Amino acid sequence: MSVVVYAPASIGNVSVGFDVLGAAVSPIDGTLLGDRVKVEAGAEAFTLKTAGRFVDKLPANPQENIVYDCWQVFARELEKKSVVLKPLTMTLEKNMPIGSGLGSSACSIVAALDALNQFHASPLDETELLALMGEMEGKISGSIHYDNVAPCYLGGVQLMLEELGIISQSVPSFDDWYWVMAYPGIKVSTAEARAILPAQYRRQDIVAHGRYLAGFIHACHTQQPELAAKMIKDVIAEPYREKLLPGFAKARSYAAAAGALATGISGSGPTLFSVCKEQAVAERVARWLEQNYVQNEEGFVHICRLDKQGSKVTGSEL
C-alpha cells in the first residue's frame, strides 16, 4: 500500500492581499510545478528518502527536514484520536526551488500531511489538516500563516479568515486568465523580505490597501475581470521589496506595455507573476522574462492557469 500526493505552487499575497490572500497555479503544458510526497509501508517507524531537481538544497539530516516535523505532528494528532500510526517510509520529491516565492515549503508540508492522512484512511478532516499545515509553515517562517498552504491544499484563490473556526474560504476567480510565473534563479529569504518592511504605515497607504483589497474581492464576486485586475496593487510590501529583486521594475514596465493586466511579486519574491487575458500576450511576456529576468540555469518561466484542485493523489508511484 502506497500513496503519492502532488501539491502545486502558490502565489502568496497576490499583491493586493498581504498575508491574507493566496492562489494556487499549475503550468498549462502539464509540467508539475510543485512537490510530490510518497508514503508507503515501512519496516521502521519513520524513514525519509529524497529525490527531485532541488534535492541538493535539502538538509542532509532527515530530522532537520520539514517532512519529519510533519510526521511528528501528524503522529501527535493521531494519538489524540487513538488512531494507530503505521510504520512508514516517506519520499519527498523536491521539484520546487527553496526561497523562491512560490510556496516551496508549503508544497512539501501540504504534500506530506495530505499523503500521511490519505495513507491512514483520512482520520483528520480538512480543517484539522489545514491547521497543522499552518503550524508547520509557522515553524519555518516564524509565524503561522496560511496564504500559501491554504491555496496549495484547497486550490484556487483563497482568502484567509481565521474566524468562527473557518481558516480560509475560496474566492470566485477568472478562469480564462493566464498567470506567467518567472523565477530568476536567485534566493530571497522570507525573513529578509519581512525585515525590510516598515513597522508603521501612513494612513493614506492603509486606506489605499483597504480599497484595493475590498475592490478586488468585490470584483471577483461580481465577476468584473477588468476591475479585479486594476485592483491588483500592493502598497504594503512591493514598494520596499522591489529593491531586493534585480530587474523587477523593468519587467513590470515591459509586461504592462505588452498588454499584461497586472504584475506583482509572488510571496516575498524573487518570483514574479504577470496576469494576462490572452495567451499570445502571456507568451510574449514569458519570452521576454526568459531572456531578461531569469539570471541563471536554475531559473524558469511557466505560463499557468489557476489550479482549482489544490493537492491531489496522483497514484501510488513517483
Curated annotation (Swiss-Prot):
Keyword Nucleotide-binding: yes
Compartment(s): Cytoplasm
Keywords for the protein's UniProt record, in alphabetical order: Amino-acid biosynthesis, ATP-binding, Cytoplasm, Kinase, Nucleotide-binding, Threonine biosynthesis, Transferase
MF (Gene Ontology): ATP binding; homoserine kinase activity
Recorded GO CC terms: cytoplasm
The keyword Kinase is annotated on this UniProt entry: yes
Entries under SUPFAM superfamilies matching the protein: GHMP Kinase, C-terminal domain (SSF55060), Ribosomal protein S5 domain 2-like (SSF54211)
Residues where ATP binds: 97-107
Pfam families attached to this UniProt entry: GHMP_kinases_C (PF08544), GHMP_kinases_N (PF00288)
Top EC group: transferase
EC number(s) reported in the record: 2.7.1.39
Top-level taxonomic group: Bacteria
Record-level GO BP terms: threonine biosynthetic process
Known pathway: Amino-acid biosynthesis; L-threonine biosynthesis; L-threonine from L-aspartate: step 4/5
Reactions catalysed, as given in the entry: L-homoserine + ATP = O-phospho-L-homoserine + ADP + H(+)
Free-text function comment from the UniProt entry: Catalyzes the ATP-dependent phosphorylation of L-homoserine to L-homoserine phosphate.
Family named by the database record: Belongs to the GHMP kinase family. Homoserine kinase subfamily.
Name of the featured protein: Homoserine kinase
Organism listed in the record: Vibrio cholerae serotype O1 (strain ATCC 39541 / Classical Ogawa 395 / O395)
Highest classification ranks of the organism: Bacteria, Pseudomonadati, Pseudomonadota, Gammaproteobacteria, Vibrionales
Gene: thrB
